[in-house]
Amino acid sequence: MILKPSKPYSFCFTTYPWKKLKLKEHSKVIIKIIDEEEIEKILDSMIIEKVEGIDYKKLKETHYESL
């Protein structure tokens, strides 16, 4: 399953305990989650950092949909 935000927000995230992705700020990413049962757990564990001009509270509430 591939997830994408339903709104076009740019965000930075940490994939702890996995390797940190070396992405430039405002990079676009596609997150592939193989185990559907883990989707909510993974999304809840993402650390969303405030990036200038982005309302991070709204970002946390963004609905994710499968492609």
UniProtKB/Swiss-Prot annotation:
It comes from the Archaea. Keywords: Toxin-antitoxin system. Belongs to the UPF0165 family. Possibly the antitoxin component of a type II toxin-antitoxin (TA) system. This is Putative antitoxin PF1308.
